[in-house]
Amino acid sequence: NRALEVGLDPWEKPLREAEARGVYQQAVLTKASEIPYPDAYFASAVSNSVLEHIPALEPVLAELGRVLRPGAAFVFCVPNQRFLGALSIGRFFDNLRLRFLGDLYRRFFNRISRHHHCDDPSTWRQRLEGAGFELVDCWDYFSPRALRVLEWGHYFGLPSLLTRLLWGRWIVAPWKWSLFFTRLITLKAYNEASIQAEGVYTFYITRKKIEN
């Protein structure tokens, strides 16, 4: 569990929290489209469920291509084209033939999730190739059942938002007995196979192209 060499974030508060936890050797407050490092500086990069929150991806991918060495790996994960369609409340309205309410809910959930992109691999391949990357491999994960746990966790977790605002902690009593029901509800989703044919997220392995 060695700390990553550099972490980037435009939001200072979570960046300082990550810094305090020792997640990064160096935490840098910056936009991903303005990385303050020279060309071909890094040998690899990772993005864990971040790119879907960035409205303009092209400048970010171009900047990432600039600071990565030729042949460097770029690994990331994002929600895919199945994400919105698998939301349980949206499907509930669809089954009642209230499609307009289902669409309204999907827009609402996408908004509170701060998603700008829930795209398929072909869309990502096009973006990546345009920025000088090649797609090495990808697979889907996180089943619709797991998404339902995540979806409802947003609502049942609202009291934790209050404790976070009041005391800076998501979990006030982090003990096994106090988290018994949380564990019971989430364990099946947590232990599911890592590759899911109908998964609503996609994991990508890419690398920066080596120019001939």
Where do the language-model regions lie?
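Residue-level detector of flexible, active-site-proximal loop/helix-junction positions
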Residues: 34, 142-145, 210
